Amino acid sequence: MGSNTDWSSNFAAAAVSAMIAYDDILVPRLFNPFADVLVDGVAVSPGLKVLDVACGPGTVSRLVAPRLGPEGSVTACDLSPAMLEVAAGKPALEGAAPITYRQCPADELDVPDGAFDIALCQQGLQFFPDRLGALAEMRRALKPGGRAGVAVWCAIEENPFWDALATAVGWILGKEAEIGYRSGPWGLPEADELARLFEVAEFSDVDVRRHALPAVFEGGPAQLVATLSAASVGPQVAALDAAGRAALLAAADAALAPLVHDGEVRSEAATHIVVAVR
């Protein structure tokens, strides 16, 4: 229960409503700011062809497309139909590169060999059952000299708001659920291990750096509890009755209390960003 596999399967099977909650809460507060850092790291310029692996609701794709201009292109891949539906339903970006969405797993990308100048992946690698296979696919898709940029969360302890939320999950749903929750997005936290994976996948000039940004949730602990619908514990949270949900909200209030100021959760988020060359 609640393993990294459960995170992946819940993403793949989640309803569109769960993905909308993810998009509304986490994307503007975390994924957009970190996508800026990720894209800056690979030196994007107009006219390039970009691959976005595990594109989710189109966060990185929509950020990079205006930088590429109409002469560039973005191909965005994800396993989750719900994520792709949310992404494809967003309005077109004026003066930006066109974005094409494709449903496929990261270790079997539906793209041609050597077609892309840049391959990006924000917070997907840690979920892939075959991480080396996914990196090999990204390398296959890149032109010689093409650049890969991959973001992977640091340890959950370096993301205090998620650490506290995991504690609340354990109090209400049990230790096994907490362990599974903690194993997901934060399941590949070591910079050395990240570098080794890229080197084994035959990338060169591998550079791993830690980046931290403020994380503010204006809606308080309840706003973070709402993100659990897209997590490994999503089905368990959905099955709670009114009393159970009230208990979960109370647990989140207690666990997150040290981070709450004027009703807002104010913390920090930290990720590793890897840049490497094919």
Residue positions per predicted region:
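Conserved Class I S-adenosyl-L-methionine
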Residues: G2-F11, M19, F31, P57-T59, ...
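Conserved class I S-adenosyl-L-methionine
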Residues: G2-L48, T59-L63, M83-V86, K90-L93, ...
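A short acidic, Gly/Pro-enriched loop at the edge of an enzyme's catalytic core
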Residues: D107-I118
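Class I SAM-dependent methyltransferase SAM/SAH-binding core
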Residues: K49-L109, G133
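Conserved hydrophobic residues forming the short capping helix/wall of the S-adenosyl-L-methionine
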Residues: L68, P91, V169, F198, ...
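A short SAM/SAH-binding and catalytic strip from SAM-dependent methyltransferases
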Residues: D117-R131, C154
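Conserved catalytic/acceptor-binding region of the Class I
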Residues: L132-G133, R139-E218
